[in-house]
Amino acid sequence: MSDMSATHGVAQPWLASYPPAVDGTTPIVAKPVYALLDDTAAQHPGNDCVDFLDKHYSYAEIKRESDKVAKGLQQIGLKPGMRLGLFLPNCPYFVIFYHGALKAGACLVNFNPLYAEPEIERQIADAEVDFMVTLDVSQLLPKLDAVLTKSRVKSVIVCPMAQQLPFPKNLVYPFVMRSVHARMRIDSRHIAYKDLVHNDGAYAPVEIDPATTVALLQYTGGTTGVPKGAMLSHANVYINAIQSKRWFYTVDSPQAKTIGVLPLFHAFAMTCVMNWTLAVGGCMILEPKFDTLKLLRLVHRKRPTALVGVPTLFNALLNFPQFKDYDLSSLVFAISGGAPLPVEIRKKFEEE
C-alpha cells in the first residue's frame, strides 16, 4: 500500500501500518448522514435494521418512519439549522428521529438520559434547542416537563414506549409497568408521536452541503469542565461511518449483527453501533441499558457478529461467575473504545 495520499500526494506514513485488507487511500465521497439509512433501505428493504427487545424493524420500516418524522417536523415549524434534542435511551425512536430530523434539515443535539434537570436546562440553553424528543417514561418525561416552562423549547414530541414493544408486551405494558409510565400533558407544547407522523412522508428535501452543514452538536463528557458542544458536519459523521466500514471488513455484509448496549447518544456508539451497522446493511440489536447477565444471554441467543464495548464492559463480562456458560463464538470481532483497553483484558477475552 502506498504511503502517499491518492488525492493530494501528501505523505501519509501511517498507511504502512494498516492491515493489507484496509483501504486507506480511495477517497470517500461525502453524503448527508441519512444516506447511510436510505442507501441501504434501497438495496435491502426487507432486511432487519433494528431488533429491540425481540421486535424487529426492517430497513423499509425505519426509512418510512424517518420520512414521516421529517415531514412532521417541517409541518410543526422546524426550519433548516434549527436544533432538535434527542432525550432518548437506545431504542428504535433514536434511529428514526436521528435520521428523520436530519432529512428535515435539523441540527441534532444528543442528551444523556441520566441528566438531572439543571443539566438538561443548561444544555437546552447552550445549544439553543427548539424541539425535544423523549419517551413517555417516568425517568425522562417528568424531568423534561420540569424545565420546559423555563426553556426556549417550542415543542416536545412524546413517543410511546409500548408501541415499540413486541406483542403481547405492547398490550400489557401500560398495566404491568404502570410505575414507570408517564402521562403526556395535553397542551400546545406537547405533540404525540402518532400525530407527528400522521402524514405521507413526502417531506420537502433540504439542500445540504456535507462539508459545511452541521449535522449535530455532540456534547463532550464534561470530565475536564462543563460539557461543550462539538460541531460535527454531515461529512464528519458520514465519512467516519464509511471509515469504520473499511476497518471492520471482516463483518462488512448485510449479515452483520451488532450488539448495541453502549448509549447511542455517545459519539462512539453512534458511529460504531448505529451508523456503521447502517453502512454495511446489518442489524443493530439495541438494549436500553447494560446488564452483564442480560448481555451474555443476548449474545448467546441472538448470535451477533460484533460487540462494541468499553474496558469496563469487557472486564465485567470476564469477571462474571458464569461467563463460560455462555456461547460467544458467533462474535467475529469485538471493539473497545472510550479508554485504553488493558492488554491483559484483551488477551483474556480473546482466549476465553
Regions found by a protein language model. Give the residues of each.
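Adenylate-forming
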Residues: T134-L144, A162-Q164, L262, F290, ...
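Flexible, non-catalytic linker and terminal segments flanking ANL/adenylate-forming cores
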Residues: M1-A30
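Conserved adenylate-forming
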Residues: L73-L78, M82, D200-T213, L217-G260, ...
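Conserved AMP-binding/adenylation subdomain of ANL enzymes
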Residues: Y238-K257, F265-A306, F320
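Conserved AMP-binding/adenylate-forming core of the ANL superfamily
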Residues: P27-V29, D38, G46-C91, V95-H99, ...
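Structural core segment of the AMP-binding/adenylate-forming
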Residues: I76, K103-D195
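A short helix-loop-beta submotif of the ANL/AMP-binding
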Residues: M82-R83, P89-V109, P113-E117, A125-F131, ...
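Flexible, low-complexity linker/hinge segments
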Residues: V22-K31, L144, Y173-V214
